[in-house]
């Protein structure tokens, strides 16, 4: 599919080398993020943006479904002016599509230092599949995404 690596981590905060325990308190300024390494010959940055938009609620400020706190904000961290321009264009197109009743609040910023999350956070959905399945069902995410994107 073009994605070579997806690494869980933290970005955007003030604390160096944060731990999950620190970030989960919501006062470090960091967001929980995924760093994507991809092959642009197989999947484009714009295609990755499309996947991103279709898997979040971009109108939710400082929460995503059952997860509440600034560490759960939606934010696109870009590398270089080309990614910045493409991300802004993508967000603007989504905003202008009138897909959502509320404004899109997803921030787009230059990528600061990426801190890799602890090993137990990598591929959490695989390592804790039963726990993740219960969470995914109870969060309301699936229903929201199906309702929002069912016509596409």
Map each language-model feature to its residues.
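Flexible coil/turn and secondary-structure edge motifs
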Residues: 1-152
């Amino acid at each position: 599919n073009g994605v070579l690596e997806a690494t869980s981590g933290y970005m955007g905060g003030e604390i160096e080398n944060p731990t999950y325990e620190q970030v989960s308190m919501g006062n470090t300024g960091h967001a929980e993020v995924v760093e994507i390494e991809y092959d642009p010959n197989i999947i484009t940055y714009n295609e990755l943006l499309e996947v991103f938009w279709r898997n979040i609620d971009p109108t939710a400020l400082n929460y995503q479904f059952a997860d509440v706190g600034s560490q759960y904000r939606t934010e696109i961290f870009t590398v270089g002016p080309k990614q910045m321009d493409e991300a802004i264009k993508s967000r603007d197109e989504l905003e202008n599509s009138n897909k959502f009743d509320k404004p899109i609040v997803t921030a787009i910023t230059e990528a600061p230092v990426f801190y890799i999350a602890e090993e137990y956070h990598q591929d959490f959905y695989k390592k804790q599949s039963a726990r993740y399945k219960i969470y995914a069902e109870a969060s309301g995410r699936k229903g929201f995404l199906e309702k929002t994107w069912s016509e596409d």
